[in-house]
Structures are given as structure tokens and as C-alpha cells.
Amino acid sequence: WIMGHMVNKIEQINEFLDLGANSIEVDIAFDELGYPEYTYHGVPCDCKRYCTKSEKIDDFIEALSAATTPGNPKFRKELTLVVFDLKTGGFDASRMYKSGKAFAELIQFSYWKGSDDAGRAYIVLSLPKLDHYEFIKAFREHFDTSTFKNLLEERVGYDFSGNEDMGLTRVVLNKAGVNDREHVWQGDGITNCILRSLDRVKAAVAIRDSATGYINKVCFWTIQAYSSVRDALNAEVDGIMTNEPGVIANVLKEDAFKDRFRLATYRDNPWETFKR
């Protein structure tokens, strides 16, 4: 998956897809009560990027639903996976559960439109800290009594992006109601302004490939240097988050990689662990 980073304006959806992405990452900002309010990253962000692009949440989710609904004039078949980078650090932790419920309602009614046929992209809920796990728990429990529980079970995955201890990550996911290998992505990375080693990525890949692991997929962020992309692919990641999708697309065409990797399509399940 080539994951377009910090896609927070409606027009950026097509912009990043046209550059070669098949996935996007969207930053979700919340009000002081934990209700989703805007798409917004804020300062600081990545080098050579504008950090303050924003849309009202309802407008963006409406456009995202259109872009991922077959038959809609704005449908883009390339967009198969959406990572919601949930900025849950801006409100009191006591509101985490209610915030998760509110976001579940937004997805059910504004993205899926209360239908099996709208908003077909797979979704990853990415939280910045392990102690925010009640957001995931609430999101999942919202669908316990819903006729759309099948969509939760088919289309939603989970990630913690804070580069915290992976053994503890497993424990916390279980506390949130997520079983081992139940749609679990493990991200690792840092802003593109700083070089980061692949040590933690390789550790995550080893857990993914272990018979007793809890991870389905591993993502590295945020890179765009050709050498960094090659190193990440050689580490066997499943996704790369980037500001320049064309770089990853070009590397995938190189002799060293063209027979080992291909761009994921909608037929590729982002919850299945790939085995060579």
C-alpha cells in the first residue's frame, strides 16, 4: 500500500491518487468534548508540507464516501484503504469512550451512509497512545447492537502510532476487545525531517511473521527518499506512508522489486498476513 500522508483537503484525495497512492492518511481533530470536528494536522508536521490544511469533518467524510462508492461519479477504484490518524490528545481522557462512540456514528451514517454499498474502503483507526484504547473499545461496542456489525468485522482495523512497546501494544489491543491478528496494523516511524532506523520495523515484521504474533501488517512512515524506500521494502513492510507516492511507485518498478512486490488492489485483504 502506498499511503498518501496528511490528506486533509478534499482536493488532495484525487491529487494523491493521481500521484500513485492507493491509500490515504487523514488527520482527525476533535473538539474539547471529544467530538470529531475537522481534518487537521497542525504544526509541526513534515518538511516541505503545509501543516494547516483543513476541512469540516462532515464535508470531508462526504467527499471520501463519494470517492469510495462504486457507481458514484467521483468514485476512484484506486482508493482501497484509509488510515484515520486520530488526534485524541486534545481532550480529557475521561471523554475517550464517548469520543469513540461519536466517531463510530460518523463512520456509520456519514461514510457508510447506513448502507453496505457506500464507502467501501477499508479503514484503519490509528491512535497516538496506548492509554487511549477506550476509543477503540467504544467504536467496536457501538456496533454490538447494530445491523452494520458485519461492516466493522469486514472493513475496520487498528493501529497505535506512538512507537510504544509492542508487547504492551498486544495487551492493550486485547483490552480494547481486539484479538491477536484481528485486523492489526503496526506502524513505525517519524517525521520525514529526521532519519530513523529500521530496527523497530524489523522487530514488528518478525512478530508479524511469527506463528504466535499479533500483527497482520506493518507500515513505515514518513519517507520519500529512494534509498529509504528500498530499505523499507527490503525489510518486507506492507505499507509505506509518504508525501511523494510517485517515488514508491517508481521503486516498485525497479528490477530488484518488480517481481517481489505489486501495488495492492481492492481484492487484496489488508487484514491478511501475506506469506511468501
Swiss-Prot record:
Cofactor: binding comment: Binds 1 Mg(2+) ion per subunit.
Single Gene Ontology BP annotation: killing of cells of another organism
Alphabetic keyword roster: Cytolysis, Dermonecrotic toxin, Disulfide bond, Hemolysis, Lipid degradation, Lipid metabolism, Lyase, Magnesium, Metal-binding, Secreted, Toxin
Coiled-coil intervals, chain numbering: none
Compartments in which it is found: Secreted
GO cellular component: extracellular region
Tissue-wise expression: Expressed by the venom gland.
Disulfide pairings: C45-C51, C47-C193
Gene3D superfamilies, sorted: Phosphatidylinositol (PI) phosphodiesterase (3.20.20.190)
Record bears the keyword Magnesium: yes
GO MF annotations, alphabetized: lyase activity; metal ion binding; phosphoric diester hydrolase activity; toxin activity
CDD domains: GDPD_like_SMaseD_PLD
Broad class of the protein's primary localization: secreted
Class of the enzyme per the UniProt entry, highest EC level: lyase
InterPro entries associated with the record: PLC-like_Pdiesterase_TIM-brl
Cofactor: Mg(2+)
EC number(s) per entry: 4.6.1.-
Sequence positions that bind Mg(2+): E25, D27, D85
Active site: H5, H41
Catalytic reaction annotation: an N-(acyl)-sphingosylphosphocholine = an N-(acyl)-sphingosyl-1,3-cyclic phosphate + choline; an N-(acyl)-sphingosylphosphoethanolamine = an N-(acyl)-sphingosyl-1,3-cyclic phosphate + ethanolamine; a 1-acyl-sn-glycero-3-phosphocholine = a 1-acyl-sn-glycero-2,3-cyclic phosphate + choline; a 1-acyl-sn-glycero-3-phosphoethanolamine = a 1-acyl-sn-glycero-2,3-cyclic phosphate + ethanolamine
Record-stated family: Belongs to the arthropod phospholipase D family. Class II subfamily.
Protein's job: Dermonecrotic toxins cleave the phosphodiester linkage between the phosphate and headgroup of certain phospholipids (sphingolipid and lysolipid substrates), forming an alcohol (often choline) and a cyclic phosphate. This toxin acts on sphingomyelin (SM). It may also act on ceramide phosphoethanolamine (CPE), lysophosphatidylcholine (LPC) and lysophosphatidylethanolamine (LPE), but not on lysophosphatidylserine (LPS), and lysophosphatidylglycerol (LPG). It acts by transphosphatidylation, releasing exclusively cyclic phosphate products as second products.
Protein name, UniProt field: Dermonecrotic toxin LlSicTox-alphaIV2i
Native source species: Loxosceles laeta (South American recluse spider)
